[in-house]
From Swiss-Prot:
One of its GO terms (molecular function) is rRNA binding. Keywords: Ribonucleoprotein, Ribosomal protein, RNA-binding, rRNA-binding, tRNA-binding. Pfam families: Ribosomal_S7 (PF00177). CDD domains: uS7_Bacteria. InterPro entries: Ribosomal_uS7, Ribosomal_uS7_bac/org-type, Ribosomal_uS7_CS, Ribosomal_uS7_dom, Ribosomal_uS7_dom_sf. This is Small ribosomal subunit protein uS7. PROSITE patterns: RIBOSOMAL_S7.
Amino acid sequence: MPRRRVIGQRKILPDPKFGSELLAKFVNILMVDGKKSTAEAIVYTALETLAQRSGKGHLEAFEVALDNVRPTVEVKSRRVGGSTYQVPVEVRPVRRNALAMRWIVEAARKRGDKSMALRLANELSDAAENKGTAVKKREDVHRMADANKAFAHYRW
């Protein structure tokens, strides 16, 4: 960790088709082995399918799905006097987006549909309707934080 100065976060270029930085980040999270064009093709196909199903715009439908998966609180381990407590802490906005996107991609990869684009479209549409694996993950994290509310005073 540098002591002299805080290094700023690298600026991410917006995605070429929709001009959205959030979508560009999503493509980067989905990308495997540096194959960005493949990841972009998968995301754009999935968004096309999602837009047809929901009747909303591509970005709007994506934003709704992402909104339903974003966590507000999570638990972090904190060691106090020989025992470890799961302390609920609020999630920073950047991490909220990152976790939501990661959970959607993980859930889509575990699905059994034919193509990745179809799996991603199905997971996004499930997330938009407040169901599916990614939303369940968020609810589990929230439940965990709620169960450990008693240790909130150990926050740092």
